[in-house]
Amino acid sequence: MTTSSYFLLVALGLLLYVFQSSFGGEHVCWLGDPNHPQGICGPQVADIVEIRCEEKEAEQGGANNARANTGRTSSLMKRRGFLSLLKKRGKRDEGSPLQRSGRGIVCECCKHHCTKEEFTEYCH
């Protein structure tokens, strides 16, 4: 393989990598990245995920009567569980000596702007 062919192959590989990382739908964040002006952060994240998950459940056949009778208690338990999961992930990442990238909900929706579909991906 000639030098120019090798250079062209490397250049195409880099171009493909840049294209995929820019338009692939996955966000990558680094410590110290600023929040997106339209990003949703803090307790609002749990509220939006809860709403999106309830909408998704309704679209897939709706909630049963037992869940409807429990009302907000069930929603509160889901929110607490979700916030607990976020705290555990945060604590796990705090101990890392490296400033590694993140691809969680904070990266997706606070550091960047989430669509409704991206919030729905966090439903269990």
UniProtKB/Swiss-Prot annotation:
Tissues showing expression: Expressed by the venom gland.
Modified residues (4-hydroxyproline): P34
Keywords: Carbohydrate metabolism, Cleavage on pair of basic residues, Disulfide bond, Gamma-carboxyglutamic acid, Glucose metabolism, Hormone, Hydroxylation, Secreted, Signal, Toxin
UniProt superkingdom: Eukaryota
Propeptide residue interval(s): 59-92
PROSITE patterns linked: INSULIN
Subcellular location per the Swiss-Prot or TrEMBL entry: Secreted
N-terminal signal peptide: 1-24
One Gene Ontology molecular-function label: hormone activity
Record family assignment: Belongs to the insulin family.
Chain's role: This venom insulin facilitates prey capture by rapidly inducing hypoglycemic shock. Intraperitoneal injection of this peptide into zebrafish lowers blood glucose with the same potency than human insulin. In vivo, when applied to water, this peptide reduces overall locomotor activity of zebrafish larvae, observed as a significant decrease in the percentage of time spent swimming and movement frequency.
Name of the protein this chain belongs to: Con-Ins Tx1
Organism: Conus textile
